């Protein structure tokens, strides 16, 4: 039976910042994200990782995306990649990305990359060889759904963050079937694939590889906009980079993301709030956790 995530649980799991620490103390995230069409996805994912406390976030993407993100989030480090004919990251960039990702704690793969052959080829190159935890989101999940097995580094954490459509593709089901059995489907897939599944939607489900199932009570329909999931994926990656076990990183990420949305809705209303508005409320939540 699923357990409901609580504020006390989340605040107890969050790592505390030490006086004698430095940026290396809080983990390194590589975000492989963005394309000419979906530049904002990379910006939101990278900032999500930083706002969740990661010490260093590197965005690997094409130059048009990097230019857009640098203007919004100068705290990022950037790895320029070759651009494909469709405006995404070319598979020819795989070797250069792999050289850099091997020094990271987490690879976030997918937000805004585009559902293209290049994305699939990059995942085949990087997933099994990255040597770090892997968070698959968006087009990373779409690419994985077409493969015979999930591409991952052996023995290292894997976190999947699908919405119902992506979960349906992973499982070979219809969206209606996924929505009719959210807890069981997420839990079964997490056990079968030895991973953490974050099945997004109303009362997001977080399932672990040992049969753990949590349901998130926070969040509201104001999150029903493009970009909300990019922030969540970045947050989970940022928390995992700081040393939280993958299940705990997912539990904390979904609760904080939803709680920030609830506070944001009080300020701006569910109609008027936008995903990037969550960052101000997220900061207030982390401040409360530090008290």
How should each PLM-predicted stretch be described?
Residues 1-133, 142-159, 164-291:
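Small-residue (G/A/S/T)-rich helix-start motifs and N-terminal tracts that mark the onset
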């Amino acid at each position: 039976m699923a357990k409901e995530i609580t504020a006390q649980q989340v605040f107890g799991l969050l790592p505390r910042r030490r006086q004698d620490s430095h940026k290396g103390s809080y983990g390194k995230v590589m975000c492989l994200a963005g394309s000419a069409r979906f530049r904002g996805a990379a910006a939101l994912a990278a900032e999500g990782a930083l706002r969740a406390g990661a010490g260093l976030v590197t965005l690997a993407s094409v130059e048009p995306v990097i230019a857009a993100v640098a203007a919004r989030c100068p705290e990022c480090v950037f790895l320029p990649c070759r651009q494909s004919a469709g405006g995404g990251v070319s598979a020819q960039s795989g070797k250069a990305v792999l050289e850099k990702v091997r020094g990271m704690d987490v690879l976030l793969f997918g937000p805004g990359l585009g559902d293209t052959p290049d994305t699939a080829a990059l995942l085949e190159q990087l997933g099994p060889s990255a040597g770090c935890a892997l968070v698959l989101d968006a087009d990373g999940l779409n690419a994985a759904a077409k493969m015979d097995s999930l591409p991952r580094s052996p023995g290292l954490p894997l976190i999947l963050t699908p919405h119902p459509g992506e979960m349906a593709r992973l499982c070979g089901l219809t969206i209606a079937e996924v929505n009719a059995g959210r807890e069981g489907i997420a839990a079964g897939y997490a056990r079968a694939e030895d991973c953490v599944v974050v099945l997004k939607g109303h009362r997001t489900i977080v399932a672990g590889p040992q049969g753990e199932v949590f349901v998130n009570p926070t969040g509201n329909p104001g999150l029903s906009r493009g970009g909300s999931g990019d922030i969540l994926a970045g947050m989970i990656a940022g928390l995992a980079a700081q040393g939280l076990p993958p299940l705990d990183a997912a539990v904390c990420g979904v609760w904080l993301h939803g709680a920030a949305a609830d506070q944001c809705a009080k300020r701006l209303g569910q109609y008027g709030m936008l995903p990037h508005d969550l960052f101000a409320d997220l900061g207030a939540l982390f401040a409360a956790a530090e008290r």
